[in-house]
Curated annotation (Swiss-Prot):
GO MF terms, alphabetically ordered: allantoinase activity; dihydroorotase activity; zinc ion binding
GO cellular component: cytoplasm
Annotated binding of Zn(2+) 1, by residue: H58, H60, D150, D303
Name of the gene this protein is made from: pyrC
Name the record gives this protein: Dihydroorotase
NCBIfam families: PRK09357.1-2 (NF006837), pyrC_multi (TIGR00857)
Pathway the protein contributes to: Pyrimidine metabolism; UMP biosynthesis via de novo pathway; (S)-dihydroorotate from bicarbonate: step 3/3
Lineage of producing organism: Bacteria, Bacillati, Bacillota, Bacilli, Bacillales
Keyword Coiled coil tagged: no
Length: 426
């Protein structure tokens, strides 16, 4: 049992109120002006924000098969440090969770080693990236969170349509990395001014937006919940906005780096700036910010994609796609958008908690009496510099190295257990 003393919580109007929070048996038992108990442990939250633990539906944990990049343990330690209490792990592992047996083995490993809640995706196709569909029903029974071939787009419309019909019958979501392989052209960055300046092959906007346009029509026909991963282009935002207006059940996420950076920020041919989707144009970034504010884009997800140093500290042509994000998500977004008065604190917290929970019908993301005690304590005055040497993640690959941010998680409770406190994993 814990009593979080002298903290602040956000009320429904987005105003800060001074409150104590009592955690008992893994639940939020009481939220009150003052709580006095004779047993349990007192946690000093003076001057700090007590918020729901963050939810990230797009995380690469790499295990099994990629343990040199990340493990379930190190990835969930990174999540705890970043204030995330629920993360959803992508299936581009070896082996791929494309069968009941592999999924059950993965669930057992998660139960054994994870510091926070991990909800694993199953792949849409066998081995991921093929045209043979998995056994959707068996994988749901084995505990799959949803279905995705993240890392590649499902290339054939017929394959995607059949997948959507099967997912809809089970009331499960299809989560899509949207990329038409015939439009990538071997690109490593956005097809724009940086690619032209550096003489690099570019990935055009239409590689993403064309597949989203196809898929929203398939989702409408199948009656499926279709979720767009890491949306990055103005055309994609337009397609999703129009689909929502038409009543199609489509949701979308955006990554912090696509909100903060664009291609003009890239300093040179450095693999640590290579990600998929790539950093787009200023106009694309503006469209993403507008789409998030008007509800076209539903929430924020990091697309935490750790790699070994030798896979990133090379030119873009040789580097792996992806950057880490779990340990920097909140500080970056708070510094760039809340401190600058572009967003309210409540908007940011909602996009990292209740919004993803609502989209995927998760019973998390709220701080209220009776809720699961997934809690992050945030010091909104704490100033620190992003230093990959301090990361719990094995991946140190971030373009934000050396950036000073204000507002950091200082403690994380997962189902009432203190898993991170003042720089230490418990």
């Amino acid at each position: 049992m814990y009593v979080l003393k002298n903290g602040q919580v956000l009320n429904a109007s987005g105003e800060l109120e001074n409150k104590d929070v009592l955690i008992q048996n893994g639940k939020v038992n009481l939220i009150a002006d003052s709580i006095e108990v004779t047993s349990g442990e007192e946690f000093d939250a003076t001057g700090k924000l007590i918020a729901p633990g963050f939810i990230d539906v797009h995380v690469h944990l790499r295990e099994p098969g990629g343990e040199h990049k990340e493990t379930i343990l190190t990835g969930t330690q990174a999540a705890a440090r970043g204030g995330y209490t629920t993360i959803c792990s992508m299936p581009n592992t070896k082996p791929v969770p494309d069968s009941k047996e592999v999924m059950e083995n993965l669930q057992a490993k998660i139960k054994e080693t994870a510091e926070v809640r991990v909800l694993p995706y199953a792949s849409i196709t066998t081995s991921l990236g093929t045209d043979e569909l998995v056994d959707f029903e068996a994988l749901k029974e084995a505990g799959a969170f949803a279905f995705t071939d993240d890392g590649v787009g499902v290339q054939l419309a017929g394959t995607m349509y059949e997948a959507m019909k099967r997912a809809a019958a089970l009331d499960m979501a299809i989560v899509a990395h949207c990329e038409d392989n015939s439009l990538i052209y071997g690109g490593v960055v956005h097809d724009g001014i940086f690619a032209e300046k550096e003489g690099l092959k570019g990935i055009p906007n239409i590689a993403e937006s064309v597949q989203i346009a196809r898929d929203v029509l398939l989702a409408e026909a199948a009656g499926c919940h279709y979720h767009v991963c890491h949306i990055s282009t103005k055309e994609s935002v337009r397609v999703v906005r129009d689909a929502k207006r038409a009543g199609i059940r489509v949701t979308a996420e955006v990554s912090p780096h696509h909100l903060i950076l664009d291609e003009e920020a890239i300093p040179g041919n450095d693999g640590n700036w290579k990600m998929n989707p790539p950093l787009r144009s200023k106009a694309d970034r503006a469209a993403l910010l507008e789409g998030l504010l008007d509800g076209t884009i539903d929430f924020i997800a990091t697309d935490h994609a750790p790699h070994a140093a030798e896979e990133k500290n090379v030119p873009m042509e040789q580097a792996a796609f992806g950057i880490v994000g779990l340990e920097t998500g909140f500080p970056l977004l708070y510094t760039h958008f809340v401190k600058t008065n572009e967003w309210t604190l409540k908007q940011l917290i909602d996009w990292m908690t209740v919004k993803p929970a609502e989209c995927f019908k998760l019973p998390y993301g709220k701080l209220e009496e009776g809720s699961v005690a997934d809690i992050v304590v945030l010091d909104l005055e704490k100033e620190a510099t992003i230093d990959p040497a301090t990361f719990y993640s094995k991946g140190k690959n971030t373009p934000f190295v050396g950036e000073t941010c204000i507002g950091w998680p200082v403690a994380t409770f997962a189902e009432g257990t203190l898993v991170y406190n003042e720089g230490e994993i418990k």
